[in-house]
A protein has these predicted regions:
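Conserved "right-hand" nucleotidyltransferase catalytic core of DNA-directed polymerases
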Residues: 1-30, 74, 91-94, 101-104, ...
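Short, low-order "capping/linker" segments at domain edges
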Residues: 563-569
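Conserved pre-motif C helix in the palm subdomain of viral-like polymerases
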Residues: 143-149, 488-508
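Conserved beta-strand -> loop -> alpha-helix junction used to position metal-binding or nucleic-acid-contacting
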Residues: 72-89, 96-101, 353-357
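Short hydrophobic beta-strand that contains or immediately precedes a catalytic carboxylate
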Residues: 56, 77-78, 343-347
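Nucleic-acid-processing active sites and adjacent nucleic-acid-binding tracks
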Residues: 16-54
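Short active-site loop/helix that positions an aromatic residue
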Residues: 60-71, 84-87, 228-235, 349-352, ...
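A common structural junction motif
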Residues: 540-550
Length: 569
């Protein structure tokens, strides 16, 4: 609705005696005959008001538009797109047409639609559908309803068989909350955003000018070739890509001791803040002083993650980093609570995993910083090379039997990892346990019952890109010994998936208390609180929604803006 769209027509399927009869009701097609909009919406409202079960595909979209028209959907709602993502989180597509073809052998014949689009001088069958007369679209819309119902008949027993109904119900229970969150939106300070943008543009111009005046180079901060010329002029060393081209990554610039790369990096950050956060997020996506961001609870063609954690779009507030001491307040400071309220940031304290870094550092006889890097890196499936990069340790290059060159950890990194694993063997034991379960069973289950599948395969010896499906892998690798791929990341999947379960359980319980979060980001829930008691209530729910042997703690901080939420009440 905030993008200027509208409902062109409604597809409805009525189920009697196990069979679905579908109808398409056009109300706002550009060409052809439409039905009276009020009559159609009254009819739809009558259906939605009843307690009979409803089946939809992408209910967030359908119910969102119905909500925009003032129509509330009562009774059980079952979403086939949600069900598909829970049954198989590794699919490439979750479109109704592709699921219908793959799982029940039902696909749509889109030739009529394509021919109609062509004959009317249009281009995109999906985007231009509303421009066509309803008779061309009706068959398409009616088949959607029938396929959706038949898919549900296939999926419902599978959810029970695989003990996933509880997970599915949790996701469905969150839909009304997510729609309410998006509908309310988040207040933004547009006047201050415009002023900050002007300041940053001046700051960027001055920074680029200072690079030229101090170092004699006009630098395009995003061009490796331009930066190379500036580095060569100052006799500064830099890395190269495997193909020999100059490389100036964020990590390289950040750790470089010279002032030139520091100014280049600062200019990049300022330019990104202007383009991504001000133009693309705060000013570019605001509607009547609010941003209506969209959360994706499960994997779909529009977003989402394989592990059940939320992703975000239109705009993606998860990009609003908290790490830059200068720029973070200029971005997060634009997000406001409701009038007379405080912004409440309730953050799980080391939700995944609990902070045990100093204990491990003492056990291994190493500093806390490398202990933390290794703890987090290894549990998330990071290899030795990436760990060396994270710790600033050197790596080596070796030539394999196939003649290819491979990067491996250097001696310092290998020695540190050997010390870590010899002194802290339980970490390797936990990694191996989850990896072996994934390898042997093909799946692991999170604390909330969510399944994480490992259905990609790779050769036991040598390296080749993994292939989805055992049969396809056997054909590709010509019956060489194969094994499941990516099982070294099983512990990461377990931790991330369980964290998603916990956050979603908390959100459902908070919603039952009549409290609506403004946003969910990583391990944090953000609220607009009238009183500290509401904050304490949400904190208690978050800490106790899932009982674990190790207590989960939540840090509650408050302020006048998102950036200012670092204080006690």
């Amino acid at each position: 609705p905030w993008g200027g769209g509208f409902i062109a027509g409604v597809g409805i399927g009525i189920v009697q005696n196990g069979a679905c009869t579908a109808y398409y009701l056009p109300i706002k097609h550009q060409n052809g005959t439409n039905f009276d909009k009020r009559w159609v919406l009254n009819y739809v409202e009558e259906i939605c008001r009843s307690q009979i079960p409803k089946v939809m595909h992408n209910c967030m979209y359908d119910m969102g538009w119905l909500k925009h028209e003032g129509i509330k959907v009562n009774g059980p709602v079952y979403d086939t797109q949600f069900a598909a993502a829970i049954l198989d989180e590794n699919r490439m597509s979750y479109s109704l047409n592709n699921l219908g073809k793959d799982w029940i052998g039902e696909g749509k014949d889109e030739n009529i639609l394509r021919e109609a689009v062509k004959s009317f001088g249009l281009k995109d069958p999906k985007k231009d559908m509303w421009r066509l007369p309803p008779e061309y679209v009706g068959v398409y819309g009616e088949q959607d309803c029938i396929t959706c119902y038949n898919l549900w008949k296939y999926m419902e027993p599978k959810l029970h068989e695989e003990k996933l109904w509880k997970v599915f119900q949790l996701e469905m229970d969150l839909v009304p909350l997510l729609l309410e969150m998006r509908g309310r939106g988040i207040k933004v300070n547009l006047d201050q955003a415009e002023k900050n943008k002007v300041k940053l543009k001046t700051r960027l111009k001055d920074l680029v000018t200072s690079i030229y005046s101090d170092y004699g180079s006009k630098v395009d901060v995003w061009s490796a070739e331009s930066i190379r010329l500036a580095f060569d002029k100052q006799n500064l060393e830099y890395g190269r890509t495997p193909t020999g081209k100059p490389s100036f990554t964020k990590e390289f610039l950040d750790k470089h001791p010279h002032e030139l790369p520091q100014r280049i990096l600062k200019a990049r950050r300022i330019e990104k803040t202007i383009s991504t956060f001000y133009d693309g997020m705060i000013l570019g996506h605001s509607h009547n002083g609010r941003i209506h961001t969209e959360l994706h609870p499960l994997k779909s063609d529009e977003g989402g993650t394989v592990g059940g954690r939320f992703s975000c779009s239109h705009p993606n507030l998860q990009q609003a980093t908290a790490r830059d001491p200068e720029l973070t307040p200029m971005v997060r400071g634009m997000f406001l609570p409701e009038e007379g309220c405080k912004w409440g940031a309730l953050d799980y304290s080391s939700q995944e995993p609990t902070d045990y870094h100093q204990m491990v550092a003492d056990m291994a006889g190493i500093d806390r910083k490398p202990a933390k890097t290794i703890n987090l890196g290894i549990t998330y499936g990071m290899g030795g090379v990436k760990l060396c990069h994270s710790l600033g340790l050197p790596t080596d290059w070796v030539v394999g039997k196939n003649g290819n060159t491979y990067e491996v950890p250097g001696d310092d990194g290998k020695n540190l990892l050997e010390t870590y694993h010899s002194k802290v063997p339980f970490v390797r034991g936990l990694i191996d346990l989850t990896a072996n379960n994934a390898q042997n069973r093909g799946w692991i289950r999170t604390a909330g019952g969510r399944l994480c599948h490992f259905d990609h395969w790779e050769p036991v010896r040598g390296y080749s890109p993994a292939v989805q499906g055992k049969k396809a892998a056997q054909e590709k690798f010509e019956n060489k010994p194969i094994r499941r791929a990516f099982t070294h990341k099983a512990l990461n999947r377990l931790i991330q998936g369980s964290a998603a379960d916990m956050t979603k359980l908390a959100m459902r319980e908070i919603w039952k208390e009549g409290i609506v979060p403004m946003h969910q980001m990583h391990d944090e829930l953000d609220f607009s609180f009238e009183s500290e008691s509401d904050g304490n209530k949400c904190k208690e729910i978050m800490e106790n929604c899932m009982k674990l042997e190790v207590p989960i703690l939540v840090d509650a901080e408050y302020g006048n803006t998102w950036a200012d939420a670092v204080h006690k009440w």
